[in-house]
Swiss-Prot record:
It comes from Danio rerio (Zebrafish). Residues 282-291 have a biased composition (Low complexity). Gene3D superfamilies: Potassium Channel Kv1.1, Chain A. Substrate-specific adapter of a BCR (BTB-CUL3-RBX1) E3 ubiquitin-protein ligase complex required for synaptic transmission. The BCR(KCTD13) E3 ubiquitin ligase complex mediates the ubiquitination of RHOA, leading to its degradation by the proteasome, thereby regulating the actin cytoskeleton and promoting synaptic transmission. It is found in: Nucleus. Keywords: Nucleus, Ubl conjugation pathway. Residues 40-108 form the BTB domain. InterPro entries: BACURD1-3, BTB/POZ_dom, SKP1/BTB/POZ_sf, T1-type_BTB. Belongs to the BACURD family. This is BTB/POZ domain-containing adapter for CUL3-mediated RhoA degradation protein 1. The keyword Acetylation does not apply. Pfam families: BTB_2.
Length: 330
């Protein structure tokens, strides 16, 4: 039971005006109440929870509770003098504390905060309504932060891509799979790929789901998904013979990655069916520095095609011509 401290015990709780002692024997009987201004204390039965407070507290703000006290809103008062309000009493203590202090700590749970907002709107407490709305907005702003999931298993990845309604960009980055030393620029290019992934994640936050895979087979590989299927792939690693030894080379095909990221936006908001035909017709794809190949089922199998772009293919030492340092094999 909620109670408000008072200076004198001489105050009296509101009762039905004109009721005789004999009428109080009818338990549960309700009668329309009159103005409560003449009373100092009010007993409230809010959805089964009992609260004891003063008319002064209820009248602090221009609200439904004030109109109940001054008689402009008719209420029911039972035979024991309780003002009956047909509302959930779970958050009514919070409502009373707001009236007493002008502010009140709000629940951490968003669901409970929305419940308090509903009660504040019902009682027409504009101060509490604004307090709830501003707190909800702040929490939503925090929740809008950029979150990039880290893949922990192949099943998790498949489920995430299949159920996501947004386009998906995945960066596979597993340096543990490297068997050879890196070329001189590979470390820098690897960091550039990671930095670009972070920048794109911030730039397209809310429109594209960016996920990172550190358990896959590739050292550095971008994959692009739309409507639950892979649309394109950009592999940034290759094996080269630079000093009579195999070395791992990591490239940074920035323009190609940007292009594929923009292409994948065609699948945003369920617009994939039209975008699919456009992508497969080559209308939005331009030739890059690397080699591009498509996997599919030929005619009639266009829906299964995946554009795989390899910036550099494998380079064989025994295929280098005289005086040449590098030979590319397609």
């Amino acid at each position: 039971m909620s109670a408000e401290a008072s200076g004198s015990s001489g105050g009296h709780a509101v009762t039905v005006s004109g009721s005789s002692p004999s009428s109080s024997s009818h338990v549960g009987e309700e009668k329309p109440g009159r103005s409560l201004v003449s009373s100092k204390y009010v007993k409230l039965n809010v959805g089964g929870t009992l609260h004891y407070t003063t008319v002064q507290t209820l009248s602090k703000e221009d609200s439904l509770l004030r109109s109940i006290c001054d008689g402009s809103t008719e209420v029911s008062i039972d035979s024991e003098g309780w003002v009956v309000l047909d509302r959930c009493g779970r958050h009514f203590s919070l409502v009373l504390n707001f009236l007493r202090d002008g502010t009140v700590p709000l629940p951490d749970s968003t669901r409970e905060l929305e419940e308090v907002l509903k009660e504040a709107q019902y009682y027409r407490l504009q101060g509490l309504v604004q307090h709830c709305l501003s707190t909800l907005q702040k929490r939503r702003d925090v929740c809008r932060g950029c979150h990039i999931p880290m893949i922990t298993s192949a099943k998790e990845e498949q489920r995430m891509i299949a159920t996501c309604r947004k386009p998906v960009v995945k960066l596979q980055n597993n340096r543990g799979n490297n068997k050879y030393s890196y070329t001189s620029n590979s470390d820098d290019n690897l960091l550039k790929n990671i930095e670009l992934f972070d920048k794109l994640g911030l730039r397209f936050n809310g429109r594209v789901l960016f996920i990172k895979d550190v358990l896959g087979d590739e050292i550095c590989c971008w994959s692009f998904y739309g409507e639950g299927r892979k649309i394109a792939e950009v592999c940034c690693t290759s094996i080269v013979y630079a000093t009579e030894k195999k070395q791992t080379k990591v490239e940074f095909p920035e323009a190609r990655i940007f292009e594929e990221t923009l292409n994948i936006l065609i699948y945003e908001n369920g617009r994939g069916s039209g975008g699919m035909a456009l992508l497969e017709s080559g209308g939005v794809s331009s030739s890059g520095a690397g080699q591009s190949e498509e996997e599919g089922a030929g005619a009639g199998g266009g829906d299964r095609r995946v554009r795989r772009i390899h910036v550099r293919r494998h380079i064989m030492h025994d295929e280098r011509g005289h005086g040449q340092q590098t030979v590319y094999k397609d």
